[in-house]
Amino acid sequence: MISMAKALNAADQNIVSETGMAARPIVLIVATYIVTTLLQGALGSIPINKILGFALVVLLIFEWVSTRRSHLSSLGLLCFVLLSLHSTLVMISASQELNDLVYLASTMLMISLICSPRFRTSILEALLQYRTYISVVVIFSSMFLLLLLATGTGYVVAWGEAPYFKGLCNTEHTLASICTLLLVLIIFLVRTNGSKAVYCGCSLVIIYATLETGARTFLVPVLICLLLLIQNLFAYKWTKAALLLLVLFFGEAVFLKSGMANKFEFASGNIYADSLLSAITNGRNEIWLTDILAWANSGSMGIAFGNAFSTIYELNKRALSLYIWAHDDLVMLLYGFGLTGLCLYLACLCTLFHSLFASLNKGAAVLLTVFILFPLLLNGFFPYQHLVYAFVLLYSICSHELIPRKDI
């Protein structure tokens, strides 16, 4: 697996044709996607997010095929197409299957593209070109979240009896992934000499909104963003250390009164948890065990090529009375795409991790690796597209010294 990853990475470093032609519309769509998702509940039946998502996948495919890649990469694409065809033959819900296939394809294409230094440079150039628009998106989103929080709009009762914040999004986790993406954009704005006061204020609102969601999986990506933000706010180490201690002190006080603390309290005291592991994972270990056992008993075709992603929802509904996915990318791939798909996904991830440690300093590479692995293993990475976009942009930002700018 490691040798395959190195071969893929080496091949993708030697792209003959120019890359990054689609970087500008990709960045524009990602920034717009933040606003349309934040306003999702106010848009009614208008499928703007599906339109943007479809356009983004088309751009990613165009960008991928416009580069002359290795035969190994082309073989990987062929495997994905064949696995998708097999999945559609055994699916039980076309809409759910298409949704997961699009999310997975988008994620794997982005991971494949971002391993190219030229594409990372193109993404950075696009960020710089649309910097004013990105600034407007960040400030508008922060003010909108502040308005919702101040008026108590967008709170729902979930996971017990405590209220959790989801704004106008469909779930709390969706909002938390948006907040992570907004923090990444703030890092970019601060690194390009944006107003520290303005974006510190925005980041405080966004972090508080994340805490109110109760989505524990996003604590680690948000914490990583916070560390990188502090790293870029001040030049002297003592000021960075002092600010970090100050943030931790006040952060603890805010955390203890937030929805996140309620979620930890509910999970640790859940009377339905039959073990410590079940309490810590909030029952995810039972989902994983159910799905892995079902995969192991699915016959040779199911073991090798999967049983479709849509069937995992029905499986968990029958076994656990919950219509949910596996809450783990590897288990999801194992059941949906079988061993073949799991190996393909792992090869893609190994290629990415090799690229991270080859292009960044060790500390940054470790942080970005944890940024992916923590949600990937404990809840899911590819189902949360805003989190995927956040990683792609963060990797591009960390790969370059940015040009100072004077506007907000």
Please report, for each region that a protein language model flagged, where it lies by residue.
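A juxtamembrane structural motif centered on a specific transmembrane helix
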Residues: 1-24, 65-68, 193-196, 359-360, ...
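N-terminal signal-anchor transmembrane segment
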Residues: 1-66, 81-93, 144-147, 372
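Transmembrane alpha-helices of multi-pass inner-membrane enzymes
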Residues: 57-58, 184, 365-375, 381-408
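Transmembrane alpha-helical segments and their membrane-water interfaces
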Residues: 58-67, 86-143, 229-233, 348-349, ...
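Hydrophobic transmembrane alpha-helices and their immediate junctions
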Residues: 67-68, 131, 196, 240, ...
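Alpha-helical transmembrane segments of multi-pass inner-membrane proteins
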Residues: 128-155, 170-232
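Flexible juxtamembrane loops connecting transmembrane helices in multi-pass membrane enzymes
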Residues: 164, 253-289, 314
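Long extracytoplasmic/lumenal interhelical loops at the membrane interface
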Residues: 278-337
